[in-house]
Regions:
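Solvent-exposed beta-strand/loop surfaces, strongest in extracytoplasmic domains of secreted
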Residues: 1-194
Length: 194
């Protein structure tokens, strides 16, 4: 039986008397969904129950499947197994397997660098701005963000609000700008009207 609530009904074949009871089957896998920022130290953590309701000790193999890739980790002394999450921004489903049990959870990886498309007039003084946050979602000052526009690279340092700014002095047209920090990239469009 999988984890869940069940009703079991017993019938006396002689008298036809019926009696029902509720049964709750608890998963051996204890886990929660995870929301984290790109490349921060947060891990996906599960705790494994033993058949008697306690927790297993060290040395039990637990398998994780995320994006079709399987990883096996071993429980520690308190029954925890941990998996580092080094995925790009997005939503993922992770499935944990232990013995005959499986359990699914959601992992959400948040961006550390974000920006909006820019529409401007030729040489109107507009700047392209990218917001950088640290692994806890707080403004990340004093960091170098790289901008790539038309194959030309610019490095700008974030201010106290975590914002890196690039002056735009291009001819009228549409351009793709890529902002990068620590392996994270985000692309935006700049539209310049004459």
């Amino acid at each position: 039986m999988g984890a869940g609530d069940y009703i079991v009904t017993a019938t006396n074949p002689v008298t036809g008397e019926m009696r029902s009871n509720s049964i709750k089957v608890i998963s051996l896998i204890e886990s929660d969904d995870l929301t984290k920022y790109y490349k921060n130290a947060s891990q996906f953590v599960v705790r494994i129950h033993s058949a008697d309701g306690g927790y297993v000790g060290a040395g039990e193999d637990v398998t994780f499947n995320i994006n079709g890739v399987f990883y096996t980790r071993t429980t520690n002394a308190t029954g925890h197994a941990k998996l580092n999450i080094n995925l790009r921004q997005g939503n993922y489903t992770i499935t944990t397997y232990y013995k005959n049990c499986s359990q699914g959870n959601e992992i959400r990886v948040l961006p550390i660098l974000s920006a909006d498309d820019l529409v401007m007039k030729y040489r109107d003084g507009s700047q392209f701005k990218a917001q950088l946050v640290d692994g806890q979602g707080k403004a990340y000052a004093g960091q170098s963000v790289q901008f790539n526009i038309n194959g030309v690279l610019y490095n700008k340092v974030t201010d106290n609000d975590g914002v890196a700014k690039l002056n735009i002095n291009l001819m009228a047209g549409q351009y793709i700008i890529t902002s990068s920090y620590n392996g994270f990239n985000t692309a935006n469009k700049i539209t310049i009207r004459g």
